[in-house]
């Protein structure tokens, strides 16, 4: 059977096609999405689908929840409620880095930069914590920079940084150090009434010690009673300060009474050795040497149960040294140095060496005193400015200026800065020994060191210079200090009298001239009479009146010139404003003014003529519509 050609070709095309496997669709699996055995399964399925599809909550529901939250009224906070201070947990991250940077500046003795950096940080993204502020305040307190301390404290209060108990204690200490116990007690009362904090044991110790130092033992006793009312436990340190106040007042019975009171409150035995030194002084004052030495054995004997700190040892050493028992003090000092084992036990401190220095100096053993003073470094104690001043004062009082100047040279080696007392002490000692130039050099160094000597030190300098016939030097120091010191009339009279006696009346008048130019200085009538009298001696009694009249004339001319300058400035401003107005606007203003003037004169304005013409065209002068044809 034959097939046609067309059919054969069609058969070949069919064979040449590639066989394609037909993929059948998978059978439908019936999954029950809308039916669950429990609500928990349904919720779990919803959460799974949201995670799989990464679905977010609907926008409208999110906005609705925000609106509901915004509609909830917030409680109104009282702005007068004091803020609570931050906890130490706030000192992390950048704020901790800032704190460490401030500590670095303080270690470098750059307190001005530390305080300035703290101020600037308040308005930065890294606000300082109260702990950083307290660090700067404490450094300023140690260096007796009380003005800077109070300024920084006022600044942080305005900045809203809540103080903590340490801040309050530093302020109390500052006012007590500058002998302002009344202000310190006012701040304490405000703290008790308003602060959201409770006082600490350190608060009462600072107040009691400061009040005793300011000879206000009665107020210190009241603070002790207030301490008991507030529920604080009996503190032997507070009692030791009160006993010290009784010793200052030569009240031996008060010392023994306080000790008995403390002993009763502690159950019959005082195990803190801080009170035994003052108790020994009380016994020595009553000439009860036997009881004093028994107290000494009870405190530091071999079988003693009394806990002795460095401060307790210092009080005992002081009691022995001041009452003819310096040999016993030396034995105790040697034993204490052996017992000293930092950091486990601190048996000596800076005060220990100061007590021994005073004991050696009282016995005239100044070489031994300087040797003990230089041993501080061996026991990890660094002398401060007060320690140097204490020993230098003892040396200067005993005409040992050379040794005092050696100690002054050691201050720079130990990175200790002299203060006003240091320079004043050396200056006065130089004057006593007739070394006027050396004393004046110490004063000049003090001024160049940015220290602020008071008027009394300046007066002593001027007195010695005038007595030595160094009027030019005295005038030079006057010119240096007149803008730095608030001089009284006596200071002006002193230098003026010296100039007058030397026949230098022109220089005296120049001083008056400068006083008249200075608005902060008042030339009193008493001073004017003094100047007139000095001028009368030289036959120039009218010069002062001429000078004052000339000053009044110059002031009047200056005031008139100031008013003229202000008027010229005002005219210049009006000219500048006129220059900003375009010329066309100026012409329009002139034309408007001309029309107004013609109207007032009774003439007919062109604008009125135009309006009348328009009225005629519209239907007459009465404004009615024209009749229709």
UniProtKB/Swiss-Prot annotation:
One of its GO terms (molecular function) is ATP binding. PPR repeats lie at residues 129-163, 164-194, 200-234, 235-265, 272-306, 309-343, 349-383, 384-418, 419-453, 454-484, 488-522. Residues 1-34 form a transit peptide. The keyword Cytoplasm does not apply. The keyword Isomerase does not apply. Keywords: Mitochondrion, Repeat, Transit peptide. Pfam families: PPR, PPR_1, PPR_2, PPR_3. SUPFAM superfamilies: TPR-like. GO terms for biological process: embryo development ending in seed dormancy; endosperm development. GO terms for cellular component: chloroplast; mitochondrion. Residues 44-79 are annotated as: Disordered. InterPro entries: Pentatricopeptide_rpt, PPR_domain-containing, TPR-like_helical_dom_sf. It is found in: Mitochondrion. Residues 63-79 have a biased composition (Low complexity). It comes from the Eukaryota. Its main location: mitochondrion. May play a role in embryogenesis. Belongs to the PPR family. P subfamily. This is Pentatricopeptide repeat-containing protein At3g49240, mitochondrial. It comes from Arabidopsis thaliana (Mouse-ear cress).
């Amino acid at each position: 059977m034959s097939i046609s050609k067309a059919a054969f070709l069609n058969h070949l095309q069919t064979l040449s096609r590639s066989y394609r496997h037909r993929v059948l669709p998978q059978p439908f699996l019936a999954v029950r999405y809308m039916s669950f055995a429990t609500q928990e399964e349904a919720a779990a399925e919803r959460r799974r689908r949201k995670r799989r599809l990464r679905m977010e909550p609907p926008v409208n529901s999110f906005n609705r929840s925000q609106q509901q939250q915004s509609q909830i009224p917030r409680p109104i906070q009282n702005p007068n409620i004091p803020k609570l201070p931050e906890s130490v947990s706030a000192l992390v991250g950048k704020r901790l880095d800032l704190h460490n940077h401030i500590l670095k500046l303080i270690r470098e003795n750059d307190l001005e930069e530390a305080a300035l950096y703290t101020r600037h940080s308040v308005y930065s993204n890294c606000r300082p914590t109260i702990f950083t502020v307290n660090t700067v305040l404490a450094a300023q307190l140690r260096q007796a920079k009380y003005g800077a301390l109070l300024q920084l404290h006022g600044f942080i209060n305005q900045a809203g940084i809540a103080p903590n108990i340490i801040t309050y204690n530093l302020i109390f200490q500052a006012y007590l150090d500058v002998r302002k116990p009344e202000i310190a007690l006012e701040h304490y009362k405000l703290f008790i009434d308003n602060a959201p904090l409770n006082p600490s044991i350190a608060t009462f110790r600072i107040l009691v010690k400061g009040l005793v130092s300011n000879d206000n033992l009665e107020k210190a006793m009241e603070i002790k009673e207030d301490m008991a009312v507030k529920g604080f436990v009996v503190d032997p340190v507070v009692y030791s300060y009160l006993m010290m106040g009784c010793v200052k007042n030569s009240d031996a019975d008060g010392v023994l009474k306080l000790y008995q009171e403390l002993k009763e409150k502690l159950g019959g035995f005082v195990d803190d050795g801080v009170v035994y030194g003052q108790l020994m002084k009380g016994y020595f004052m009553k000439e009860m040497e036997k009881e004093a030495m028994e107290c000494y054995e009870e405190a530091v004997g071999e079988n003693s149960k009394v806990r002795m700190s460095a401060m307790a040892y210092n009080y005992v050493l002081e009691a022995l040294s001041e009452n003819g028992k310096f040999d016993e003090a030396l034995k105790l000092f040697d034993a204490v140095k052996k017992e000293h084992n930092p950091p486990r036990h601190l048996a000596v401190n800076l005060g220990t060496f100061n007590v021994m220095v005073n004991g050696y100096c009282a016995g005239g053993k100044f070489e031994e005193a300087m040797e003990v003073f230089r041993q501080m470094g061996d026991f990890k104690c660094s002398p401060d400015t007060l320690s140097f001043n204490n020993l230098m004062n003892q040396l200067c009082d005993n005409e040992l200026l050379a040794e005092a100047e050696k100690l002054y040279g050691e201050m720079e080696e130990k990175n200790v800065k002299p203060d006003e007392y240091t320079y004043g002490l050396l200056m006065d000692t130089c004057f006593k020994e007739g070394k006027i130039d050396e004393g004046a050099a110490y004063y000049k160094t003090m001024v160049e060191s940015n220290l602020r000597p008071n008027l009394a030190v300046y007066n002593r300098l001027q007195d010695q210079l005038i007595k030595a016939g160094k009027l030019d030097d005295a005038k030079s120091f006057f010119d240096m200090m007149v803008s730095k010191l608030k001089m009284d009339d006596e200071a002006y009279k002193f230098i003026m009298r010296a100039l007058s006696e030397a026949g230098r009346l022109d220089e005296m008048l120049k001083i008056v001239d400068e006083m008249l130019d200075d608005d902060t200085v008042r030339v009193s009538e008493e001073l004017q009479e003094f100047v007139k009298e000095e001028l009368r001696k030289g036959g120039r009694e009218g010069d002062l009146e001429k000078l004052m009249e000339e000053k009044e004339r110059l002031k009047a001319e200056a005031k008139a010139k100031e008013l003229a300058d202000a008027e010229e400035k005002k005219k210049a401003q009006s000219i500048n404003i006129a220059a900003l107005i375009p010329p066309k606007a100026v012409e329009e203003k002139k034309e408007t003014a001309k029309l107004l003037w013609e109207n007032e004169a009774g003439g007919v304005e062109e604008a009125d003529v135009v309006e009348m013409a328009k009225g005629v065209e519209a239907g007459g002068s009465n404004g009615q519509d024209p009749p229709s044809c």
